[in-house]
């Protein structure tokens, strides 16, 4: 049994052990987790496995009963940090059983040609395309197996007093419901209601940045019961200032995300504009999507905004904590939003296992996490530039080839993407490694260039002077 995990299976249900019941001088904490998405349900599961009473609140209906899930991308890229968090609660293999491995990027140029850039040619590691709904259902089903978790769907947080641990919700009948908790954990997304309470507290630092790029989701359907493109890749159509990506789904379709500056979206006024734009920029994707389906999907909704949020501290005394997007929302271009949020839970669980006083535990979490959270927010911004533009440049291909060669020769030379996606190395250390590698390569190339000049000069002098 992992350190700090104090539950056991009894008659098919997870029951807290006696050690859990004795925690905190003979009583368990009552924890309120706000938000039953991926991070919230995972956090609830971990708190309950440590013996706490958990109330899990979600303002939407139970995703397992929803006919249509609105507002969020339907598939995600699961990497090592998320896998580690799922493995800790015994769910990794269940999730991977229905996930689709993506071994690299397949790049599509404007002429319709494609080429492959593998993520990890050395160890053959890959990302996994997972359905948001399916993953959320797996986590919620695991929560249902624990008797000390109570789920409250369609309960919207309307107010909270963090000092007192009191909350008020609006239930489906539009009635006010009062609740109390020893610890309030906000996992309620980029526009977190819990974080809004933190903003009003002294010493809380907060910044947000909207980028000038929006996104729309389209779909490449299956054909004759199969994928229309190779399934085991993240497909990218890089076009300098904009791009399109596609991830495979279990039903043999692809979820397509078109990311462009809002001014380009605004320039597409009608069906003819749209079709001409796709014929010019995405000629190979147009017949896969289908003209009529493209028109329907493109004009049925407006482009969505993307925001990057940084804040600190993540806690208030021993009363409240924020995790996931509530603490560090990021643009989706490194595929780390979900993975970073799940890693929050892993780190918090490890610190809780130290059994420090709760105020020290939460303070240690903030101190241990904020620099890494800031780092991945910055990396996500950078990767958007890389995906839409740099991936099609020869310099990017050269650096990728060089990183792969050096990684093969010197295992300690871990490329940036590998360290972020295929390890649990702290994000700030990933950046520090990249800076060190850049400096070393500059020195090597500088010395090589200088040696070439000196050698060339010497040869010239011998021959002509």
From Swiss-Prot:
The gene is cn. Pathway: Cofactor biosynthesis; NAD(+) biosynthesis; quinolinate from L-kynurenine: step 1/3. It is found in: Mitochondrion; Membrane. GO terms for biological process: 'de novo' NAD biosynthetic process from L-tryptophan; anthranilate metabolic process; compound eye pigmentation; kynurenine metabolic process; L-tryptophan catabolic process; NAD metabolic process; quinolinate biosynthetic process. InterPro entries: FAD-bd, FAD/NAD-bd_sf, Kynurenine_monooxygenase. Residues 1-26 are annotated as: Disordered. Its EC number is 1.14.13.9. The lineage of its organism: Eukaryota, Metazoa, Ecdysozoa, Arthropoda, Hexapoda. It is a multi-pass membrane protein. One of its GO terms (cellular component) is mitochondrial outer membrane. The keyword Transmembrane helix applies. GO terms for molecular function: FAD binding; kynurenine 3-monooxygenase activity. It comes from the Eukaryota. Residues 15-25 have a biased composition (Basic and acidic residues). Catalyzes the hydroxylation of L-kynurenine (L-Kyn) to form 3-hydroxy-L-kynurenine (L-3OHKyn). Required for synthesis of quinolinic acid. The chain crosses the membrane at residues 405-427, 440-462. It comes from Drosophila melanogaster (Fruit fly). Pfam families: FAD_binding_3 (PF01494). Belongs to the aromatic-ring hydroxylase family. KMO subfamily. It catalyses: L-kynurenine + NADPH + O2 + H(+) = 3-hydroxy-L-kynurenine + NADP(+) + H2O. Its main location: mitochondrion. This is Kynurenine 3-monooxygenase. Its cofactor is FAD. Keywords: FAD, Flavoprotein, Membrane, Mitochondrion, Monooxygenase, NADP, Oxidoreductase, Pyridine nucleotide biosynthesis, Transmembrane, Transmembrane helix. The keyword Flavoprotein applies. It is an enzyme of class 1 (oxidoreductase).
């Amino acid at each position: 049994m992992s350190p700090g995990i104090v539950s056991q299976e009894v008659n098919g249900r997870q029951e807290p052990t006696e050690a859990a019941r004795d925690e905190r001088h003979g009583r368990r904490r009552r924890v309120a987790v706000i938000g039953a998405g991926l991070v919230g349900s995972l956090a609830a599961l971990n708190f309950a496995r440590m013996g706490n009473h958990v109330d899990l609140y979600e303002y939407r209906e139970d995703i397992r009963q929803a006919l249509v899930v609105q507002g969020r991308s339907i598939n995600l890229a699961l990497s090592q940090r998320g896998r580690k968090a799922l493995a800790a609660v015994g769910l990794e293999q269940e999730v991977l059983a229905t996930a689709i491995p993506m071994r690299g990027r397949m790049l599509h140029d404007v002429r319709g040609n494609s080429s492959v850039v593998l993520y990890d040619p050395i160890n053959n590691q890959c990302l996994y395309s997972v359905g948001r709904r399916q993953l959320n259902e797996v986590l919620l089903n695991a929560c249902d197996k624990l008797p000390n978790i109570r789920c409250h769907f369609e309960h919207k947080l309307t107010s909270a007093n963090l000092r007192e641990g009191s909350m008020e919700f609006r239930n489906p009948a539009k009635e006010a419901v009062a609740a109390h908790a020893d610890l309030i954990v906000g996992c309620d997304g980029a526009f977190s209601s819990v974080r809004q309470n933190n903003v009003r507290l002294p010493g809380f630092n907060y910044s947000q940045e909207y980028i000038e790029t929006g996104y729309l989701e389209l779909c490449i359907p299956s054909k004759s019961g199969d994928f229309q493109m190779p399934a085991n890749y993240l497909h990218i159509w890089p076009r300098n200032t904009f791009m399109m990506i596609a991830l495979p789904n279990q039903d043999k379709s692809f979820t397509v995300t078109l990311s462009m500056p809002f001014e380009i979206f605004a320039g597409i006024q009608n069906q003819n504009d749209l079709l001409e734009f796709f014929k010019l920029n995405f000629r190979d994707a147009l017949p896969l999507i289908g003209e009529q389906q493209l028109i329907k999907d493109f004009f049925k909704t407006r482009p969505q905004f993307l925001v990057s949020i940084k804040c600190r501290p993540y806690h208030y005394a021993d009363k409240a904590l924020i995790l996931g997007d509530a603490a560090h929302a990021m643009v989706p271009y490194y595929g780390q939003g979900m993975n970073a949020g799940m890693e929050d839970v892993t780190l918090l669980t490890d610190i809780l296992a130290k059994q420090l006083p709760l105020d020290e535990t939460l303070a240690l979490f903030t101190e241990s996490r904020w620099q890494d959270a800031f780092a991945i927010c910055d990396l996500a911004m950078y990767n958007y530039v890389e995906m839409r533009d740099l991936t099609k440049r020869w310099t990017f291909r050269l650096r990728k080839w060089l990183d792969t060669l050096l990684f093969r020769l010197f295992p300690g030379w871990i490329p940036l993407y590998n360290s972020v996606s295929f390890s649990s190395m702290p994000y700030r250390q990933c950046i520090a490694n990249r800076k060190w590698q850049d400096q070393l390569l500059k020195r090597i190339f500088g010395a090589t260039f200088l040696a070439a000049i000196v050698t060339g000069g010497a040869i010239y002098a011998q021959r002509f002077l």
